[in-house]
């Protein structure tokens, strides 16, 4: 029996959009405060005082709608994957749905699975559309992640997200899913208990038994079941908590770094958690050619990975310029110091 996940009707992406806040803090500025001189990234994004996961999701959703060119009322589900929702009890997806004019005839929910909550929403949307229950569903991955002051996570925990509108594969879809595969184990590498402000992690335990075990198994299984090798893919996007991990995963799997670098943004915007691979794939779609095949592999602590094989279609050529591109947001930046960063992130407890 095949391990692949395939819907009864083929599903594609009819619209996508990303958003990254414009504020940045350099890793060396964080290091200056804490006396650290080696850094996992160059700089990271910081949300503005009036930005949160919902506003990031709204901006990304609006960009996705611009490319999809459909009436938002046709969207029958909006699912937001995040681990930093503004409300403990109140859905964020409903706010996004209202803001883009999609209410009231739709389903909305918030998904959680650490950093792979966004691709959990993608998997659900593929099933929803692929089953014929709906013709359009939106999946969003967005976060405004936090790191304890002085902890090495503080150097990478960032903000950003992306939205994807899924539809039955047609000449209007700009890419389609060949198949997907999910792999999960009970691996307590990273967690945050209720009422705690910052997450805790298992240091080195987050690497080999968590990130690499899930990523490698998910990617290998998907490729083996499809009969593909790294040579069959033009791009590969892996979850990117830093720069080192995805490049190491690529090397283990046999992908040259040239296929990874176009979607590897963590070095210049940080780890956007649930948005990480969704933003990375959006950057690849901004430059990909029809016929290109993309390997997309997420990771979420706790732990698990979703792997997708995505094939770019002709419609990408006419649709990608209908909304701001991912690098437009990456290159739009305003640097702040640690004091302003602490203010923006609510690190002052009065």
Curated annotation (Swiss-Prot):
Keyword set, alphabetical order: Acyltransferase, Isoprene biosynthesis, Transferase
The annotated active site, in chain numbering, is 83 (proton donor/acceptor), 115 (acyl-thioester intermediate), 239 (proton donor/acceptor)
Q: What molecular functions are annotated in GO for this chain? A: acetyl-CoA C-acetyltransferase activity; hydroxymethylglutaryl-CoA synthase activity
Its Enzyme Commission number(s) read 2.3.3.10
Which reaction is the catalytic activity of this chain?
A: acetoacetyl-CoA + acetyl-CoA + H2O = (3S)-3-hydroxy-3-methylglutaryl-CoA + CoA + H(+)
**Residues involved in (3S)-3-hydroxy-3-methylglutaryl-CoA binding:** 115, 156, 206, 239, 271, 301
| SUPFAM superfamilies membership | Thiolase-like (SSF53901)
UniProt pathway: Metabolic intermediate biosynthesis; (R)-mevalonate biosynthesis; (R)-mevalonate from acetyl-CoA: step 2/3
Q: Name one Pfam family in it.
A: ACP_syn_III_C
Q: Name one GO biological process term.
A: isopentenyl diphosphate biosynthetic process, mevalonate pathway
Q: What is the native source organism of this protein?
A: Thermococcus kodakarensis (strain ATCC BAA-918 / JCM 12380 / KOD1) (Pyrococcus kodakaraensis (strain KOD1))
InterPro entries in UniProt: ACP_syn_III_C, HMG_CoA_Synthase, Thiolase-like
Give the multimer and partner information.
Interacts with acetoacetyl-CoA thiolase that catalyzes the precedent step in the pathway and with a DUF35 protein. The acetoacetyl-CoA thiolase/HMG-CoA synthase complex channels the intermediate via a fused CoA-binding site, which allows for efficient coupling of the endergonic thiolase reaction with the exergonic HMGCS reaction.
- Similarity-based family: Belongs to the thiolase-like superfamily. Archaeal HMG-CoA synthase family.
Binding residue positions for CoA: 204, 244
Protein name listed in UniProt: Hydroxymethylglutaryl-CoA synthase
Q: Output the superkingdom of the source species.
A: Archaea
Q: State what this protein does.
A: Catalyzes the condensation of acetyl-CoA with acetoacetyl-CoA to form 3-hydroxy-3-methylglutaryl-CoA (HMG-CoA). Functions in the mevalonate (MVA) pathway leading to isopentenyl diphosphate (IPP), a key precursor for the biosynthesis of isoprenoid compounds that are building blocks of archaeal membrane lipids.
């Amino acid at each position: 029996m095949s391990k692949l996940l395939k819907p009864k009707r083929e599903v594609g992406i009819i619209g996508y959009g990303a958003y990254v806040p414009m504020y940045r803090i350099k890793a060396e500025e964080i290091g200056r405060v804490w006396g650290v001189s080696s850094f996992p990234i160059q700089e990271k994004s910081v949300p503005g005082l009036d930005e949160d996961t919902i506003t990031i999701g709204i901006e990304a959703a609006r960009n996705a709608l611009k490319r999809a060119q459909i009436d938002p009322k046709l969207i029958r589900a909006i699912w937001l994957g995040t681990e930093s929702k503004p409300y403990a009890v109140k859905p964020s997806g409903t706010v996004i749905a209202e803001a883009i004019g999609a209410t009231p005839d739709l389903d909305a929910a918030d998904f959680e699975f650490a950093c792979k909550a966004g691709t959990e929403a993608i998997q659900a949307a593929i099933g929803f559309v692929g089953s014929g229950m709906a013709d359009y569903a939106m999946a969003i991955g967005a976060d405004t992640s936090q790191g304890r002051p002085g902890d090495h996570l503080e150097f990478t925990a960032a903000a950003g997200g992306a939205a994807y509108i899924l539809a039955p594969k047609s000449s209007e879809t700009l890419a389609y899913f060949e198949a997907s595969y999910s792999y999960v184990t009970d691996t307590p590498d990273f967690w945050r208990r209720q009422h705690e402000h910052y997450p805790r992690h298992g240091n080195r335990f987050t690497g080999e038994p968590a990130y690499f075990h899930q990523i490698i198994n998910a990617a290998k299984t998907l490729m083996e079941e499809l009969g593909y090798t790294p040579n069959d893919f033009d791009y590969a996007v892996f979850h990117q908590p830093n720069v080192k991990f995805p490049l190491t995963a690529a090397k283990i799997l046999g992908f040259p770094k040239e296929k990874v670098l176009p979607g590897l943004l963590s070095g210049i915007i940080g780890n956007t958690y649930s948005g990480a691979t969704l933003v990375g794939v959006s950057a690849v779609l901004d430059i990909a050619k029809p016929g290109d095949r993309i390997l997309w592999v997420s990771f979420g602590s706790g732990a698990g990975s979703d792997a997708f094989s995505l094939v770019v279609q002709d419609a990408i050529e006419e649709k990608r310029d209908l909304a701001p591109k991912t690098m437009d947001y990456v290159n739009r930046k305003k640097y702040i110091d640690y004091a302003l960063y602490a203010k923006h992130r609510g690190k002052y407890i009065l």
